[in-house]
């Protein structure tokens, strides 16, 4: 994986090999208006009361105050700000009108399975419990520790549950050249933080049989629950043979969930940024400043990993991820009960089981500490961030990236940098790419104003029906900050 400083001559970001092939398969028009369909999900989703105890207090870094002097860091002529789109993106070709697709019969079956709280042991936990429609299909089933709570008391998954919106675009796990000048291939894609599943159907099975998640003992147990469900007849009609054997039931369950999770409902492209790309909305000056900092390699350099194309009027070209892997050295989440064991680490990609027939091995120690780069779409709606859920505020995430190298004491209070990676693998952590390549006590690449601007820009990636909620939250925050 290329981790050296990029050339200061600004050129378009190379498209990974998988993306070139995938782009040909994208539909020319993607349904945008999702509100009415999501309301069905929002209304049907069961809610779970937060757990009474978290097993320890959460580490929540305070709002950073980076010295104003940091904004005076010298910038060479070669580090000039990369030009970004104007306030209104040009329309290259006609944009089809938005429509609201009704879920098909097959998609409705998948939705019913997704919401079914009887599919866990003991009952009470559904897919939607950890991938809550109310928080852009992310969340942790009421857990206060940053990782998903399982169906059994005291049991927790290893990681923060990611959003399952836009999963239709995630390619299967594979190795490819990340940049045109690379010699060695790097890992891309796969569902989950470590790419354990190649398809949504395969991904959907994982929590069902995890003892710390939905805790089913066998396919026969799940098949019995499906046969007794209120949607059993619909499942059998839409997926013939689904109830005949446990294996057939599991196959149908995976297919039904895949049909639902890859529907247009789950990839709506209804954010303000999407309207901006279509030429139907303007970004505010603060949001434009954030977009500029997001792209500028002398500032955030976020676009290198969270790829987007502000000059394209097609939102589906801006998924805000390359689906590559990176080791960023996030702080250890000490609110996770299992982390009380100092020898317990989540090694990420290198723990992934190698599948037969694949020439390159993801278990190579150089990938220890690496996790798949998530999409930033709807990131402002999420309640937990990073694979271990250590951050609860989006602003802290941006500040971490900006100051991890320059002010490590803000993030690693116990002295050791990269304290959630074993000593022997800490050299894997990315210290070469912008903005990680600054020395300790150097001025950070981003000052407070830059961080606020990037957060404002990231809020424009919020789809309906979440947009109004983000706007209300921002207004509430502004009101509190101006009140004497």
Put a short name on every predicted segment.
Residues 31-43:
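Bacterial N-terminal signal peptides
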Residues 1-26:
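N-terminal secretory signal peptides that target proteins for export/translocation
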Residues 2-3, 45-484:
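Periplasmic c-type cytochrome electron-transfer domains
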Residues 8, 15-17, 33, 56-60, ...:
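Intrinsically disordered low-complexity regions specifically enriched for long asparagine
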Residues 7, 23, 28-29, 36, ...:
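Serine residues within intrinsically disordered or low-complexity segments
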